[in-house]
Amino acid sequence: MKIRQFCEFDRSDLIKLWHAVFPDDPSHNEPSKVIEAKLAIDNLIFIAEHEGLIIGACMAGYDGHRGWLYAVAVCNEQRRSGVGSALVQHAIQALKVMGCIKVNLQIRATNTEVTTFYKSLGFVIEERLSMGTFIG
């Protein structure tokens, strides 16, 4: 497995992976728009590749103060094989090089499987309330 930065030729395969892993994502998370918006800011999209196929991806961000993991996706056939962990560690290292000292993420409170995954990587549940509003 190789982890590398997203390249334009990855776009269609990344969108397919996203749809497969996040079939119930709301319409405001439509992957082609999210990818375009993310690339306009930075190139913190990482691809896990095996034998020329995209098997996972991680989208991260850095606002100059905190780092964020926005999405980690691994194809069903490769889950629990270390791909997700490797992607997260790669993203964290890239953020660290940029000067980031803390990485945040948000997951649904009911998603216990993903909570366990992130805890295994050193993340802890913080006493925070996440709020949001749609403006567009």
Task: Show the residue positions of the predicted features.
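Charged catalytic carboxylate motif
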Residues: 13, 86-87, 113
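Acetyl-CoA-dependent GNAT
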Residues: 5-71, 75, 94, 125-128, ...
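Conserved beta-strand-loop-alpha-helix junction that forms the acyl-donor binding cleft
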Residues: 105-114, 132-136
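Conserved acetyl-CoA-binding loop-helix of GNAT-fold acetyltransferases
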Residues: 80-93, 120
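Active-site acidic-Proline motif in GNAT/NAT acetyltransferases
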Residues: 75-81, 109-110
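Short acidic, glycine/proline-enriched helix-loop-strand junctions
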Residues: 113-127
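Conserved GNAT acetyl-CoA-binding A-motif
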Residues: 95-107
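Extreme N-terminal starter segment of soluble prokaryotic enzymes
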Residues: 1-2
